Amino acid sequence: MSRGTGAGYDRHITIFSPEGRLYQVEYAFKAVKSAGVTSIGVRGKDSVCVVTQKKVPDKLLDHTSVTHLFPITKYIGLLATGLTADARSLVYQARNEAAEFRFKWGYEMPVDVLAKWIADKAQVYTQHAYMRPLGVVAMVLGYDEEKNAQLFKCDPAGHFFGHKATSAGLKEQEAINFLEKKMKDDPQFSYEETVQIAISALQSVLQEDFKATEIEVGVVRKDDRVFRALTTEEIDQHLTAISERD
């Protein structure tokens, strides 16, 4: 096999190929897409919303135990797209880090600080052979007193950026194309508009009309700054509003 085909280089996390690629990191991104789920995040004027598909792989599973939404603190939420087991490991560590921050400094960990910590952790995994990169893209959301609504996306390569709107997973690029059109004039969405834009973006790229039990929606609002997942009844109300508007 020729030197440039990647033979051998895909077996090591820490070695660049002659083309300057880290194959194991690229495979981690493929693992995120292979989960077959698409997620959307939208930041409004005074709220943030994330929405993802809720796929229950087995009819005998209790669907209430299947989730991609995780509270890190009372005020910060995380939406994980990719391998659920990797996500739980990341969430456990993030909760521990946030608790230590609260204990040490006496105030809640800011959203951007947590996002940077997650990204730093992911970047270290690309440098050491004893750990593989996590097959997870994490959207971190919260409301900051100084910076208002915050939405960050952290990926297996260690990147993290703040976003007005973003997507992860199988139909990521299609969703980003849809969101770019909606966010073109930098609209200041109300809470209801933020939630409904996120849901309608997911419906549009997947060309499906969802039932309330088929998606998960997580929100943070300026009013109380608490992260929570919407109930099935609340999701149903937004789905009805979207169908009536369309």
UniProtKB/Swiss-Prot annotation:
Pfam families: Proteasome, Proteasome_A_N. Its main location: cytoplasm. One of its GO terms (cellular component) is nucleus. Keywords: Cytoplasm, Nucleus, Proteasome. GO terms for biological process: proteasome-mediated ubiquitin-dependent protein catabolic process. SMART domains: Proteasome_A_N. Disulfide bonds: none annotated. PROSITE patterns: PROTEASOME_ALPHA_1, PROTEASOME_ALPHA_2. It is found in: Cytoplasm; Nucleus. Transmembrane segments: none annotated. The proteasome is a multicatalytic proteinase complex which is characterized by its ability to cleave peptides with Arg, Phe, Tyr, Leu, and Glu adjacent to the leaving group at neutral or slightly basic pH. The proteasome has an ATP-dependent proteolytic activity. Belongs to the peptidase T1A family. PANTHER family: PROTEASOME SUBUNIT ALPHA/BETA. The 26S proteasome consists of a 20S proteasome core and two 19S regulatory subunits. The 20S proteasome core is composed of 28 subunits that are arranged in four stacked rings, resulting in a barrel-shaped structure. The two end rings are each formed by seven alpha subunits, and the two central rings are each formed by seven beta subunits. The catalytic chamber with the active sites is on the inside of the barrel. NCBIfam families: PRK03996.1. This is Proteasome subunit alpha type-6. It comes from Oryza sativa subsp. japonica (Rice).
